[in-house]
Amino acid sequence: MLYILNEIICIFYNFLITKMASAEFFQDISGIIKNNEERLSYGISVTDFNKDGQFEFIVTGFRHPNLALSYKKGFLENLINEEIFSDDIRSTIGVAACDIDNDGFEELYFLNTDTYSGRKQYSDRLLDSQTKIIDLFEIEKNLNL
């Protein structure tokens, strides 16, 4: 019985490997991104950060601007150019979207790294989009957290 089970597993494994090698899981759509320059981007999240009813791809920029890409007339283009969001002097490597203040809209947490050890020069960001984009970490009551 064990021998038969082992044979079945080997056949199934070989079938999967063969099919996976020939499958096209991803498609290169980089041609539809407007102003698509070479850059380092290590993180992505999907949310409706600007509250327009459409999801944006929030793309981190490692020493490049963070982007909020959304479809406009068949192309992906950056919708947010505010300095506090773009933040190209920081080295952003991760992003997460979550409604932390329970207002029904997601905030963005940007993980920044500018050193491999020791104290960071630039802090992370926790951005909220109200009438303008603000960093909740920079509000006075949160400065010593």
How should each PLM-predicted stretch be described?
Residues M1-L2, M20:
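Eukaryotic N-terminal low-complexity, Ser/Thr- and Lys/Arg-rich leader segments
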Residues F15-K19:
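Short hydrophobic alpha-helical membrane-anchoring segments
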Residues M20-L145:
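Beta-propeller-forming repeat regions
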